[in-house]
Amino acid sequence: MSNEKIAILGPGSWGTALAQVLNDNGHQVCLWGDSQEQIDEINQKHTNTRYFKDIVIDEKIKATTDLKEALKDANAILFVVPTKVTRLVAKQVAETLDHKVIMMHASKGLEPGTHERLSTVISEEVPAELRSEIVVVSGPSHAEETIVRDITLITAASRDLEAAKYVQALFSNHYFRLYTNSDVIGVETAGALKNIIAVGAGALHGLGYGDNAKAAVITRGLAEITRLGVKLGADPLTYSGLSGVGDLIVTGTSVHSRNWRAGDALGRGEKLEDIERNMGMVIEGISTTKVAYEIAQELGVYMPITTAIYKSIYEGAGIKESILGMMSNEFRSENEWH
């Protein structure tokens, strides 16, 4: 498959990296964003230095601030915008798009307020006559590695297997490979909730704890992610795959992860507002912590790590006290599902 036209909504680090993958596969790629300065840089200098200091983007990759131009004749649309603006952008797409396309998203979060997964948000705003079933593109992937063509394996999840296979063929090449999955709930919740655990793992590092503690929070984090996901209707096997444990490992152990770095800074005593300002990028794990905590409280799901991070971020509890407080929780079996 080649020479498809793909509109990528969001010229951030991951949107730019995915644009290069698609360009390498012979597709026409148009990045859409709202910063004229950034769009001009991509078109004129073929760089995106806010995210990649020393990377040159192929000159065939185009960028625009005009949504109508980006969507014109597109075969597929990929949302890679922050969770909090996904609904707004989806509304704009619905108002602008004039033909049916394959629709994908590669963002990882849950919408604040509604608690909805992003495929649901997009489906609510874009009528069915303009789109396929949403395909979720998710898995263990640092943009910094994908942009230099390091080997990356992720998941294309959709209730429509043919749409998932289309996306699989669209992206896959010698360094980037997709596997299909029909469990959209599992893939989306895994991608969103692992950011919370990454904040916790980073906080342990910032506090000076070693590998034992980090392994514990990642492993028990996977357990509580799975508990909540299954309660929401996910297949538990999904959490042992690329979009589950794979994404949790890459996000919960690496300095490339903005959520891990945010947790590390919290552990070292920095204030959240300073962290967000210094990073200059959206830290999805912060808002997702609140959403996940609220869902867990509503459904009665035991999520001690999420609760500890929530209390630290939103109730002013010390991060060290919150995390160490889990050590005095009631004894439990490792395999409890509630």
Swiss-Prot record:
Catalytic reactions of this protein: sn-glycerol 3-phosphate + NAD(+) = dihydroxyacetone phosphate + NADH + H(+); sn-glycerol 3-phosphate + NADP(+) = dihydroxyacetone phosphate + NADPH + H(+)
NCBIfam families: PRK00094.1-2, PRK00094.1-3, PRK00094.1-4
Active site residues according to the UniProt entry: K194 (proton acceptor)
Organism: Streptococcus uberis (strain ATCC BAA-854 / 0140J)
Alphabetical keyword list: Cytoplasm, Lipid biosynthesis, Lipid metabolism, NAD, NADP, Nucleotide-binding, Oxidoreductase, Phospholipid biosynthesis, Phospholipid metabolism
Family membership noted in the UniProt record: Belongs to the NAD-dependent glycerol-3-phosphate dehydrogenase family.
This protein's name: Glycerol-3-phosphate dehydrogenase [NAD(P)+]
Keyword rRNA processing tagged: no
Residue numbers binding sn-glycerol 3-phosphate: K108, G139, S141, K194, D247, S257, R258, N259
Binding site for NADPH: S13, W14, K108, A143, R258, V282, E284
Main location: cytoplasm
